[in-house]
Amino acid sequence: MKYRLGDARVETHPDSWIAPSAAVIGKVRLDAGASVWFGAVLRGDNELIHIGEHSNVQDGSVMHTDMGYPLTLGKGVTVGHNAMLHGCSVGDYSLVGINAVILNGAKIGKYCIIGANALIPEGKEIPDGSLVMGSPGKVVRELSEPQKKMLEASAAHYVHNARRYARDLVEDPA
């Protein structure tokens, strides 16, 4: 569900999709093929939250900003279930694992995997092509080319799945 907050309106591309139980509020922009899944909350009450083309925010994830810390997902980003992102940027074709936390001012490069339950502290910069694990998150190695292709496939799968849900999801009161 989209909500206006004062003059701040959610901007959606016609090819984006928001699940009925998601809450997308205020200064939020979804590009073509972007999707926000069930129970996710994107609260753009301070700064812009920009969800790039073909990016997906999965079930239960929370995104928020502080003044001076907008939140940006590049192209083809996958944000796993129950992740929490706050005032950060995530580069193209990166994956944020289940329950991962990324804090204000952190910058995740392109083609990165932030492992499940990882914590990326404020202001931390992660180089392109990194696998990050732990709390606090540490680069454990570089991704292989097949792993990078898997990140592209993950994003493409969610674009296809969102289109299927937009077309076929019907409330069933029975």
Curated annotation (Swiss-Prot):
What organism is recorded for this protein? Pseudomonas aeruginosa (strain ATCC 15692 / DSM 22644 / CIP 104116 / JCM 14847 / LMG 12228 / 1C / PRS 101 / PAO1)
Which family does the record claim for this protein? Belongs to the gamma-class carbonic anhydrase family.
Q: What is this protein called?
A: Uncharacterized protein PA3753
Q: List the PANTHER family.
A: DYNACTIN SUBUNIT P25 (PTHR13061), GAMMA CARBONIC ANHYDRASE-LIKE 1, MITOCHONDRIAL-RELATED (PTHR13061:SF29)
